């Protein structure tokens, strides 16, 4: 009997270790390639959404999308976890200054290495648009209140 309990415990430890980085995420968060994500149905301005993200977990910010795979993951997270799908979802990027160019950094400080624009405008903040199944970026007025996705 003792041997059975020891073996069962050993298998449990192995199974838990094989689950990967998902075990490192807070409850209610989802993992993708070593990062944790959570979709929030709270309606906030871009700045307020960023503040909420930083209060949720250590190192958290509005999501920074760095690949098409991550874009697909975030789109799926939004559609599966939000009851009411509005037109836009905040992401952690905004235009800085008067030039119609994207700032070279996400709100978490990482460089922009992947872009997926619908079209570039100068409304200063960016979000994902429902019409593109939340896969394309669109400029939105920063004072508009939208749901958002945090990444830690």
From Swiss-Prot:
Transmembrane segments: none annotated. One of its GO terms (molecular function) is toxin activity. Keywords: Blood coagulation cascade inhibiting toxin, Calcium, Disulfide bond, Hemostasis impairing toxin, Metal-binding, Secreted, Signal, Toxin. InterPro entries: C-type_lectin-like (IPR001304), C-type_lectin-like/link_sf (IPR016186), C-type_lectin/snaclec_domain (IPR050111), C-type_lectin_CS (IPR018378), CTDL_fold (IPR016187). Residues 1-23 form the signal peptide. PROSITE patterns: C_TYPE_LECTIN_1, C_TYPE_LECTIN_2. Disulfide bonds join 25-36, 53-150, 125-142. The keyword Signal applies. Expressed by the venom gland. Residues 24-152 form the C-type lectin domain. Ca(2+) binds at residues 64, 66, 70, 151. It comes from the Eukaryota. One of its GO terms (cellular component) is extracellular region. Pfam families: Lectin_C. It is found in: Secreted. Calcium is required for ligand binding. Belongs to the snaclec family. Anticoagulant protein which binds to the gamma-carboxyglutamic acid-domain regions of factors IX (F9) and factor X (F10) in the presence of calcium with a 1 to 1 stoichiometry. Heterodimer of subunits A and B; disulfide-linked. This is Snaclec coagulation factor IX/factor X-binding protein subunit A. It comes from Protobothrops flavoviridis (Habu).
